[in-house]
Structures are given as C-alpha cells and as structure tokens.
C-alpha cells in the first residue's frame, strides 16, 4: 500500500498521526515488528476541564486545561492567539492551539519550541510502503512490547504475518 508520509524513517517507538480534514478521523502510522503499519481510527472528543493557571510558551499566552484520554490524565497549555483546535499527537479539542501537553506520570511530554509562519515552503512527502491493520491489533502489540519485550521481539519471525493480519512477501 502506498502512503504519503513525512520525510524520514519511522523508528520503533515513533508514531505519526495524520489528521483527516475536513472530515474527521486520524490516520496513524507506526513501526511494529520492523514494519511500518497504518491504521484508521476515529477522532475522540475529549472532556476538557478548564483550570486556573497560565504561562507563556514561545511568546504566546497560554491557558491551562486537563482531561483523561487513553488511560492518562493530560495537563495542557493552549493559546487562544492561534484559534486552531489542534495539538500534539492525538490531543486536541480546545478553542486554541495546544502548545504543551504532559501526562500526570511524566511519561510523556510534548512542548512547542518554535512557530514559524508565512514560510512559503512546500511540504515534502515520500511514499512509504505500509501494511494496513487495525488500531486494536496495534494496541495489543504495543501492550505486549511494553510488558514483555522478549516475547514481542520473537514475533519478528514468520509469526508476525498472523499477528498483523498479512502474509509477508
């Protein structure tokens, strides 16, 4: 399957999320078992709690909010100066751009370090061969990778075709 992906290799712990506008839905690309896999999933509406607190990130005044998403409590800082309901990874849904997001266990942290505008530079993409799968299969493999990396790494043989739902060539 041909897929347009941003330049650069996808590492084993990397995930790219391409948001499908104007329709809703995420197209995610990640590396599992040594292959780039692709899957669709719906965009999930988050139940944000607007909190007291503000800060400045890359020159933008930001407000604080939090929500539970994917089993984690996320605290974010967003700016109304960029009225785009977007943010890092799959974190979105506020009235402004999310410039920082941290989970409560400090296992994941995203922070904007620079914003450039009016660059007039074309976006470059490269065609990558990706294996279509489902979000559920990817989730199960990620859970196995996190809980038992030895068992996960043994799947790199012929068994991975059965797990991912494809037959290797």
Indicate where each model-derived feature is located:
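Extended soluble regions of mature proteins
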Residues: 1-169
């Amino acid at each position: 399957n041909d897929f347009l992906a941003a330049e650069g290799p996808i590492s084993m712990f990397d995930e790219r999320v391409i948001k499908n506008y104007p329709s809703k839905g995420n197209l995610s690309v990640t590396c599992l078992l040594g292959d780039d896999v692709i899957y669709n999933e719906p965009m999930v509406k988050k139940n944000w709690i607007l909190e007291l607190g503000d800060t400045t990130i890359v020159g933008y005044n930001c407000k604080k909010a939090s929500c539970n998403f994917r089993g984690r409590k996320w605290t974010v800082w967003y700016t109304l100066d960029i009225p785009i309901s977007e943010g890092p990874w799959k974190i979105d849904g506020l009235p402004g751009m999310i410039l920082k997001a941290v989970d409560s266990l400090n296992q994941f942290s995203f922070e904007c370090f620079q914003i450039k505008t009016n660059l007039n530079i074309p976006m470059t993409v490269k065609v990558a061969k990706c294996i279509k799968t489902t979000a559920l299969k990817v989730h199960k493999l990620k859970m196995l990778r996190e809980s038992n990396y030895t068992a996960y790494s043994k799947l790199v043989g012929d068994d991975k075709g059965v797990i991912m739902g494809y037959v290797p060539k």
